[in-house]
Amino acid sequence: IIAVSTVDQVGSRLLFRGYGVSERMSSVHAGLLGHDTLFLLDEVHLSVPFAQTLAALQQHWRRFHGAPWPDRWGVVNLSATPVVSVDAHPFTLDAADRVHPVLRKRLNASKRAELRPVKVSGDEDERRHGFAQAAVEAASEMVKGGAKAVGVVVNRVDTVRRIAALLEGRADIDVCLLTGRMRPLDREQAVGMIWERVRAGRERASVEKPLLVVSTQAIEAGADFDFDALVTECASLDALRQRFGRLDRLDELGATRAVILARSDDLGQRADDPIYGTALRATWEWLHTLEQVDFGIERLPKPD
């Protein structure tokens, strides 16, 4: 079998966290990738964390299975700079780091969120439209509250397009759409047009119009955006933490607003999301056990 894929898709499956893979099938995907496999890692200098993960997993396996056993997989690094080392001592914060005034402020920042279920009914088209309407209403609340840069992050490109259609023609706001399906050139142009209004560390001067950035999961990586408020569709816990990392990144606002939306049909006992599987529902249920939902780095407890 020859499989061509991305680092995210392969890495998540190898670690039993495959995107869109159910809990029951996660071991199957990990087993197929984790035994008798040759990884051809293209442009390894752009995928150093994945190369390090492969090497670390190999070392971990060797602790339990020494020499006569062959390696579980091979790796060919296709790059002009293929040097990848594995640090046996992972990076952590020490006591001095935690008392540093800048870092301490960011670690202790509060990012409270409201859990808001969205009642949907009818056929799939009607349910998607109803959810998009709820997202627009939540974002409009943020704008009325004074937020000048609002992130709206949802799980599907179709939802992004529906939200854009509902916002079309509004003269009181600017709207920018970002999805993983955009051509790199189009994405760069779109980001370039809004960069000074969303970059971390900017001067939050008054602007004529608020900006709504409507995006999919594409915003979770490689985007140094800093929103004043956030509206997000519920997802897995790790995905939500990434999204909240785009909210008041430097703790300059002190108090922020965020809403987590979930379709009612995604919360049923048999609900199995095409992207996040049962993790979406499990995350929603776990968040409901908290007295206060706060996605600040040091404020969100670790689930059992």
Regions flagged by a language model, labelled:
Residues V214, I219-C234, T256-I260:
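A short beta-strand element within the Helicase C-terminal
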Residues P68-G74, L78-V143:
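Interdomain hinge/linker at the junction between the two RecA-like core domains of SF2 helicases
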Residues I1-L15, R202-E220:
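Conserved two-lobed SF2 helicase motor
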Residues E137-S140, A147, R162, L166-E196, ...:
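C-terminal helicase lobe and adjacent C-terminal extensions/tails of nucleic-acid helicase motors
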Residues R183-S215:
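Conserved helicase ATPase core of P-loop NTP-dependent helicases/translocases
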Residues D8-A67:
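SF2 helicase catalytic motif II
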Residues N77, K148-N155, L178:
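Conserved RecA-like ASCE P-loop NTPase motor core of nucleic-acid helicases/translocases
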